[in-house]
UniProtKB/Swiss-Prot annotation:
This is Serine--tRNA ligase. It catalyses: tRNA(Ser) + L-serine + ATP = L-seryl-tRNA(Ser) + AMP + diphosphate + H(+); tRNA(Sec) + L-serine + ATP = L-seryl-tRNA(Sec) + AMP + diphosphate + H(+). Pathway: Aminoacyl-tRNA biosynthesis; selenocysteinyl-tRNA(Sec) biosynthesis; L-seryl-tRNA(Sec) from L-serine and tRNA(Sec): step 1/1. Its EC number is 6.1.1.11. One of its GO terms (cellular component) is cytoplasm. It holds the Pfam family tRNA-synt_2b. Its main location: cytoplasm. Homodimer. The tRNA molecule binds across the dimer. It is found in: Cytoplasm. It comes from Treponema pallidum (strain Nichols). InterPro entries: aa-tRNA-synt_IIb (IPR002314), aa-tRNA-synth_II (IPR006195), aa-tRNA-synth_II/BPL/LPL (IPR045864), Ser-tRNA-ligase_type_1 (IPR002317), Ser-tRNA-synth_1_N (IPR015866), SerRS_1_N_sf (IPR042103), SerRS_core (IPR033729), tRNA-bd_arm (IPR010978). It comes from the Bacteria.
Length: 426
C-alpha cells in the first residue's frame, strides 16, 4: 500500500503510474478522502481540546448556573466527538479500501507494456541443446519414463492434478534438498510453512482471494485460504511486529505446497506440468532496510541464476514490463528456461524475483527500529528458488536423447542417487 501523504503530494506521478500499470483506480477520489480525513482529524482534535478545557473549568469553583452550562457544554461536546469519531472511522475505512486498489510505484528501468510479450530480455545463459532428432515434450517423456501419472490425477482430483511416482518422486526430493542446501549455505533460514493462511494475511500480501479472476482457493465459511506460494506465509510471518535494525536483512527459504486455480489458463503452453493446481515450491523471502533493497533484489536474481546454471538448464532473464507486474512489485525479473519440447522450442517462466519495497509492509504493519529508536517500514522482497513442476519440465526436455533417456545434472546426482532416467514404457 502506498503512503497517504505520498499520494497527496505526488498526485500526477501516482496517476501516471496507474496508467502504465494498466490498473483502474480513482486517484482523485483517494485524495478527496484523504483531505476529508485530515479535516476530520483536525476538527476532532479541536473538539477534544474543548472538552478538556470544559472539564478543567468544571473543577473550579462555579455557581449553579455556570456549572449547569458546563454540564450542557460537556454533553454537547461528547455527542459531537462521538459523531466525528464515527465519521472518521467511516472515511478511514473508505480511504483504506480505495488506496489498497492502487499498485506499488514502478522502477524507472521497468519497460512500459501491457503483457508478458512486452517484457524485455536482458541476458541469456547457457546454450539450448541442438538435437539431431525431434525432441519429445515432457508429457511424452514422463509417460515413457513412467514417472508422472496425469490420468490418475485427473480421475482422483480433477484436471491439472498429477501423481509423481518412481524416480519422479526422488527427483523432486533431490531438487528440494539441493535447493535447501544451496540457500542455507548462503545464509537463508529454512522454513516449512503452513498450507493455509488467514484471508487477511493473503490480502495483506497483495493477493486477491475473491472474484472470478482470483487464483486463490478460499475455504468456504472459514475466512482462510490455501496458499498459492510461501511468499504469503513468509511475508506474514512478522505481521504486526517491530524488528531490530541490527537483525536485518532477514533471509528466509520457505518450502511449501502451492495451490492455484489457474483460472482461464489454456493452450499448448499450459499442458502437462506447466500450469497445475498443486505443486511444490522453494521460495526465497527477505526483510531489509530501504537502503538495502535494490542490492538485495539483485542478489536474489543472481542466486536464481546460480541455481539454474548448476542444473545445466539454459535460461534467459527478462525485465517484466509495467503492465505485467503484480500490484505489490516495484520491480521484477523473470527467469525463463528453454523448453525444447514445445513446438520449435521456446522459453517458459520458471522463476521470478520481486522487490515490493514497503508496499506489503504497510499493509501488514511490519516495521523496524533504528539505532535512534525511530520506527520505519521494512522493505520486503521475494524470489523463486525452485518451482519443482516447471524445473522438472526443463530437466526432462533438455536432458533427453533420441531413445528417451534423460541425463540428470551432476548437481542433483548426490541427492537422487542416479545419473540417468531410462524408459519403461515402449
Amino acid at each position: 500500500m502506498l503512503d497517504y501523504r505520498f499520494i497527496r503530494e505526488n498526485v500526477d506521478a501516482v496517476k501516471e503510474n496507474v496508467k502504465v500499470r494498466n490498473v483502474h483506480a480513482d486517484v482523485d477520489a483517494i485524495v478527496h478522502l484523504y483531505d476529508q480525513r485530515v479535516k476530520l482529524l483536525a476538527e476532532l482534535q479541536e473538539l477534544q481540546r474543548a472538552r478538556n478545557e470544559n472539564a478543567q473549568t468544571m473543577k473550579s469553583s462555579l455557581d449553579a448556573l455556570a456549572r449547569s452550562a458546563c454540564v450542557e457544554t460537556g454533553r454537547a461536546l461528547k455527542d459531537r466527538i462521538a459523531h466525528s469519531e464515527r465519521l472518521l472511522v467511516q472515511i478511514s475505512d473508505q480511504l483504506l479500501s480505495a488506496t489498497q486498489a492502487l499498485p506499488n510505484m514502478t522502477h524507472m528501468c521497468t519497460p512500459h507494456g501491457r503483457s508478458d510479450s512486452d517484457n524485455l530480455e536482458i541476458k541469456r545463459c547457457g546454450v539450448p541443446p541442438c538435437f539431431s532428432f525431434s525432441p519429445r515434450d515432457h508429457v511424452e517423456l514422463a509417460r515413457l519414463l513412467d514417472i508422472v501419472d496425469f490420468e490418475a490425477g485427473k480421475k482422483v482430483s480433477g484436471i491439472k492434478f498429477y501423481y509423481l511416482k518412481r524416480e519422479g518422486v526422488l527427483l523432486e526430493q533431490a531438487l528440494i534438498m539441493f535447493g535447501l542446501q544451496f540457500l542455507q549455505e548462503r545464509g537463508f533460514v529454512p522454513f516449512l510453512t503452513p498450507d493455509i493462511a488467514r484471508e487477511g494475511m493473503v490480502c495483506g500480501l497483495g493477493f486477491n482471494p475473491r472474484g472470478s479472476g482470483s487464483n486463490i482457493y478460499r475455504i468456504e465459511g472459514e475466512h482462510r485460504c490455501l496458499v498459492a506460494t510461501a511468499e504469503i506465509t513468509l511475508g506474514a510471518y512478522h505481521a504486526g511486529e517491530v524488528l531490530e535494525e541490527r537483525s536485518l536483512p532477514r533471509l528466509y527459504a520457505g518450502l511449501s505446497h502451492c495451490f492455484r486455480k489457474e483460472a482461464g489458463a489454456a493452450g499448448q503452453f499450459s499442458r502437462g506440468l506447466y500450469r497445475v493446481h498443486q505443486f511444490t515450491k522453494l521460495e526465497m523471502f527477505a526483510y531489509c532496510t530501504p537502503s538495502d533493497s535494490e542490492c538485495l533484489h539483485e542478489r536474489l536474481r543472481s542466486l536464481e541464476e546460480e541455481i539454474f546454471t548448476a542444473l545445466e538448464i539454459p535460461f534467459r532473464v527478462v525485465e517484466v514490463c509495467a503492465g505485467d507486474l503484480g500490484a505489490p512489485a516495484y520491480r521484477k525479473w523473470d527467469l525463463e528456461a528453454w523448453m525444447p519440447g514445445r513446438q520449435g522450442g521456446s522459453w517458459g517462466e520458471v522463476t521470478s524475483a520481486s522487490n515490493c519495497t514497503d508496499y506489503q509492509a504497510r499493509r501488514l504493519n511490519v516495521r523496524y527500529k533504528d539505532a535512534e529508536g525511530k520506527k520505519h517500514y521494512v522493505h520486503m522482497l521475494n524470489g523463486t528458488a525452485l518451482a519443482i513442476s516447471r524445473v522438472l519440465i526443463a530437466l526432462l526436455e533438455n536432458g533427453q536423447d533420441a531413445e528417451g533417456r534423460v541425463r540428470i545434472p551432476q548437481a542433483l546426482v548426490p541427492f537422487c542417487g542416479f545419473e540417468y532416467l531410462y524408459p519403461r514404457v515402449l
